[in-house]
Swiss-Prot record:
One of its GO terms (biological process) is membrane lipid biosynthetic process. It comes from Thermococcus kodakarensis (strain ATCC BAA-918 / JCM 12380 / KOD1). NCBIfam families: GG-red-SF. Keywords: FAD, Flavoprotein, Lipid biosynthesis, Lipid metabolism, Oxidoreductase, Phospholipid biosynthesis, Phospholipid metabolism. This is Digeranylgeranylglycerophospholipid reductase. Belongs to the geranylgeranyl reductase family. DGGGPL reductase subfamily.
Length: 395
């Protein structure tokens, strides 16, 4: 079989359908493919996202994929100090990713894109030294898909970006290992997400409880992937220490989480890479849905312009714009992550005691200069040359 489109998008997670929808809306022929039998499965996500993304990226606020509205967060230090951020208005939601991802593909289809599940991209097709399409397998049948532009939105292990010669390598230290139970659990405020920090609790990461119902939540952990012990070991240890029986497990999810190593070259000739495939993830908390939406929006803008003007060199503006905007922000967040890796449990106790909720949000988003300057004046920071040195790395 042979097919021809203006654009083929490989991967129907978050970034892929955003690109497919936006380009199809502009009147171009688009094919969105995903290797899974059912788009959205298996879940590899804690499912929390800011309320702001729905308006910003023109996504309907549909109760079919929203499990619970969230009003803030609660952070716990190694010694049990707490920092609560509670808002009067909804600040975020816990999604049902299996439904959300499928609905994003649905919106792309409604905009005019063709969407095919169980279609796996295997390689690129080259003609006279140029990439002109991809080789794929659709329901076990070989197919050649020719396209003017190819979008690699196929996740952390992106086949298409690698086959196209885009350097997506990142060392193991730039990944976290994630392990998560969806389980019955009680005793936590279901209107907040809950995060526990500590070098013995979750090395370089945190434990999370993200409520999906009054007594049901995603309970998971992310730790450095080069740790000799597994994420499951630390999660089960935390559950046992907190007397939470792991006997009502509805689902188990595992995954590799990029927390750095952003891909430098986001467009090469007629190939564009977005989302997890480009490591476009917040290095502090490992969340990448909003980042994928932003990257997909920027990429689709330049894809449309390149097609309209029949000038593929315009795709390079995607790389330029992303690095000048979200890339610049995420590089600042990465600096924070590098510093937090050096914090002791005593440091974590101190900062959770003296930071406000607004301060914590600014640090996680990369807008931290004023917060750091204020911390540098705190007596317990001034008394420690090591803490002073660490914080000054962020300025």
């Amino acid at each position: 079989m042979t097919w021809k489109y203006d654009v083929v998008v490989v991967g129907s997670g978050i970034a892929g359908p955003i690109v497919a929808r936006n380009v199809a809306k502009a009147g171009f022929s688009v094919l969105l493919i995903d290797k899974k039998w059912a788009i959205g499965t298996p879940k590899q996500c804690a499912e929390a996202i800011s309320i702001k993304v729905f308006d910003k990226y023109d996504i309907p606020y549909d109760k079919r994929f929203i499990n619970r509205e969230i009003y803030g967060a609660k952070l716990y230090s190694p010694s049990g100090y707490e920092l609560e951020m509670r808002y009067k208005e909804v600040s975020g939601v816990i999604l049902e990713r299996k439904v959300f991802d499928k609905m994003l593909a649905y919106y792309a289809a409604k905009a005019g894109a063709d969407v095919l599940a169980r279609t796996e991209a295997l390689d690129v097709i080259r003609k006279d030294g140029k990439i002109v399409g991809i080789k794929a397998k659709h329901e076990d049948e070989p197919v050649e898909i020719y396209a003017d532009i190819i979008v690699a939105a196929d996740g952390v292990e992106s086949t298409i970006a690698r086959k196209a010669g885009i350097n997506t390598y990142a060392p193991p230290h730039e990944f976290d290992s994630g392990y998560e139970y969806e389980m019955l659990i009680e005793g936590f405020d279901p209107d907040l997400i809950h995060l526990w920090f500590g070098n013995e609790v979750a090395p370089r990461g945190y434990v999370w409880v993200f409520p999906k119902d009054e007594d049901r939540a995603n309970v998971g952990i992310g730790i450095n992937s080069d740790n000799p012990k597994t994420a499951k070991y630390y999660l089960d240890k935390w559950l046992e220490e907190n007397n939470i029986p792991a006997k009502k497990l509805l689902e188990i999810n595992v995954g590799l989480i990029p927390v750095g190593g952003f891909v430098k070259e986001l467009a090469k000739d007629n190939v564009v890479v977005v989302g997890d495939a480009a490591r476009q993830v917040n290095p502090m908390h490992g969340g990448g849905m909003a980042e994928a939406m932003e990257a997909g929006t920027i990429a689709s803008k330049w894809i449309v312009k390149a097609l309209e003007e029949e000038n593929l060199s315009l795709l390079q503006n995607y790389t330029k714009e992303w690095w000048e905007t979200d890339g610049k922000r995420l590089e600042k967040v990465l600096k924070v992550r590098r510093v937090t890796e050096k914090l002791t449990d005593e440091d974590l106790d101190l900062f959770i005691q003296i930071l406000s909720g607004a301060d914590a949000e600014k640090i996680a988003s990369g807008d931290y200069a004023e917060v750091i300057k204020a911390l540098l004046k705190h007596p317990k920071v001034l008394m420690s040359k090591r803490r002073l040195s660490l914080l000054k790395e962020l300025l």
